[in-house]
Amino acid sequence: MKGFFYFDLYFSGMSVATSKTFFSAFLKTLGLLWGFILTGLFLDSNLMQQWIAEPQWIANSVMFIGFFLCFKNVTLRIKEQMITAVIIAVLGEYLFSIALGMYTYRLENVPHYVPPGHALVYVGVLYFTKTAFTKLNRRLLEKIFTIIVLVYAVVFLIFENDIFGFLMTTLTLLVLRKRPRERLFYLSMYLTVAYLEIVGTNFFCWEWPSSAFNVFSFLPSANPPSGISFFYFGLDLGCLWLYKKRHKIAWNRMKNQRMIMLKSS
């Protein structure tokens, strides 16, 4: 776990940044993240309650350890974005879960492992999109991931009457049509969130009501809804917006460098 998503460290003998096969790129970023998600949510699951009366403190402890290992190994820029992600996630979780009742956690609280978990999801997806393999095969991955997203949303619509999730998926894909530079990042985020939600709801860590926000009966929802990553995008955009505001000069310099590269290509 010491090499969490860090370009300059080596995991299995290869740098994450230079991973040139899908297996290598996935294993060292999303694979590691998905495995950590599975482990952490299992520790807060109904299965763990068969052995420990209240296991959530264990899940919290494991998350804080994982967050620390990741945080100390990433760049200063990513450190800042991780802190921002945690702050935005705290506000978002209390707004959507506690205030609006969009979903409900097992103990009707916001578990301490959730906000830092948002930050790890952000970092894991970000580094997957920065690997050598994804850079070389970006368009192919975008097509494959889009097909998977569509199939996933349609299956939930047909078999779970997930109109709310399908609507969120449709909005996501429409937004991504005009954001080609971020498309692979958000498609990867969609799939990661779908995995996270399936694991979390099947472990009874949280649940979603049968309609959107448990209010809009004309928007039936599955548990979980398929396209809920649409709301995760607010976290990512918030991190990016705050970073740009704090580092205007560096951000403008990076934009100018991109324009030069595009003109010369």
Where are these regions (language model features)?
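N-terminal leader/targeting segments
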Residues: 1-6
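Aromatic-rich, lipid-facing transmembrane alpha helices and their immediate juxtamembrane interface loops
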Residues: 7-265
